[in-house]
Amino acid sequence: KAIDNLKLIKLQEDSISENTCLHLGHAYLRLDDLEKAKLAYATAIRYNIDPKLREEAMYNYVQATYLHNSALGESVTAFQDFIQEYPNSQYINKVYTLMADMYLTSKNYQAALDALLTIPTPDDKMQETMQYLRYQLAVDAFVQGKMTDVIKWANLVIENAAQPSTYKTEAYYLAAQAHYRLHQYPQTIAQLQLYLEQSNIAESTNKTMALYLHAYALFNQ
């Protein structure tokens, strides 16, 4: 009903039309008609008459683009346009969070982490996500055989851990594996000792392998 009523308004180059398109977008968004929501918000943005309405329309366009699972390039452009135009917006942290989630879904962990690192005061959930991303970057580096990068990312996980956590514990183990492959046996032993000292070590599935690795490192040093 709201959509039918809004459609009756003749669109012109004025603030009433801009507001109409914004609310059409809201109505379509509630109906999960994301393509029509995007078009309505895009029209409101194009009018560019009321600065506050434009900001709200751009933010909601970002949301609709994200929810629509649009092509990565289109989504990135929407995020970047908003961030560039409204760096101090009340919506900016939410935009960065959505941007990070988009990159996370596409497994672009570095870009996701970069997006979250721009948030001045990340909450606990964001901090946890950043730890996950650092750990995944360490794992990816390990798979690619980039042991120096493994150590770098594992150390960042450890340094940014406010308390014992799975990521911190496993980062010690991953760093030990990287040091071992670099034939750095004293560092391997040191990382494994820290790994084994963690309060949640009983939850780790790598404990048995760590003990073997510890013995091999002692033998080789």
Name each model-derived stretch.
Residues 1-221:
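Acidic, polar-rich low-complexity tracts and alpha-helical solenoid repeat scaffolds
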